[in-house]
Amino acid sequence: ISWHLALLLGLDLNDKNRVTFNELTETGIKAGMSHPRSIDINLVNAQQARRILDRLVGYKLSPFLWRKIRKGLSAGRVQSVAVKMICDRENEIRAFVSQEYWSIDGKFSANGERKTFAAKLNTVDGEKPELKNKEQADEILKRLEGAEFVIDKVKKSVHRKSPAAPFTTSTLQQEASRRLSFQARRTMKTAQELYEGVEINDMGQTGLITYMRTDSLRISDEARAAAYDFIRKKYGDKYIPDTPKKYKTKGNAQDAHEAIRPTHPEVTPDMVKASGVTSDQYKLYKLIWERFIASQMSNCLMDTVSVDISANGCNFKATGYSVKFDGFTVLYEEAKDDEGEKKNVLPPIKSGDSIKVRNLEENQHFTQPPARYTEATLVKAFEETGIGRPSTYVPTITTIINRNYVERDGKQLKPTSLGEVTNQLMSEHFDKIVDVKF
């Protein structure tokens, strides 16, 4: 855009007539205006190359689809690969053959206590058991009838759990889908509103977040200092890490903008809510704000315990933990921990203590096919494979749904018959173009 404007206005491309803003705040705009630069012609050429590739693919292949299938269809450098990924996953699901397997779980008590804890069969005669049917599970239970269980080993350690990095476009869309059930389009629409600015009490029209189309994990020193100031006042010095948290941006990232973060860390979600913003704006701002503040906090420290229990060559393993210092988890956690592990509170125990088995049971399971993509997992796959850019994730998903190549089934994305026919045709005749690595 800046290159086109410079040409129309007759400006010298070598002059410093380009300004950039990472946030629409007074500070951000003044900083941009005071540090102009010349137009980066390499970025201009990169955009031109992408546009040419898009046209070479789209302009040539779309008419081919019109002739072979029907009018109105389209193909594209990114959208056709996205359809192929979804079709390939569907074929994996169809080809999947579920396998039966069994597990053996025990309830134990130590030192005469009535309270029990859980342990799972881990090895049999030093090998991982493969119990493929009930008969094999029954053999293990028979082998353990009347057996004397002993505690072989108790291992204690401290586990350090680090906070998640601040959001990129991809991770924001994924987490908003998981936590808020927002589709990617809804997330980006709301993020755009927060970036452009909303009315905040005593602040007027204020841009609340930095630019929301980014693949960078970098944050400014000023933002980190503001986060520390809030953390210190709210939680105390022990919640500030000894060394600043710095997150490594992926190698294929452009790193043109900071990570997505609040422009004013001191503006809490409650303050934003009190200003009368929409429900979506409040929810998304709260998610972005909590994630950013937590990313700059101390690690969570957990005391972990692992207990090995054996009888007749069968080894059971119990694991559990307790929180020693909550750290960043006082504010935010990316995903729920294993609830079963949380509830498995182990008693004070050491090697050689008496142990009694209270119950042994066998449980049947079946292996599960790979899950269909959701918007969140598809965006994650885009990022991991380098397909598209943060600015194209939502348009790509919107296009393949609007073209009726893909449809929603709850949160899942599945190919339509039209999508599968189109993908098969593209894969047979233009396999390199629909290759993920193209």
Description of each model-found segment:
Residues 1-380, 392-396, 401-405, 410-413, ...:
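Toprim catalytic domain recognition across nucleic-acid enzymes
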Residues 179, 385-386:
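Flexible beta-alpha connector loops of hexameric P-loop NTPases
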Residues 432-438:
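Short, intrinsically disordered, charge-balanced linker/junction segments flanking boundaries
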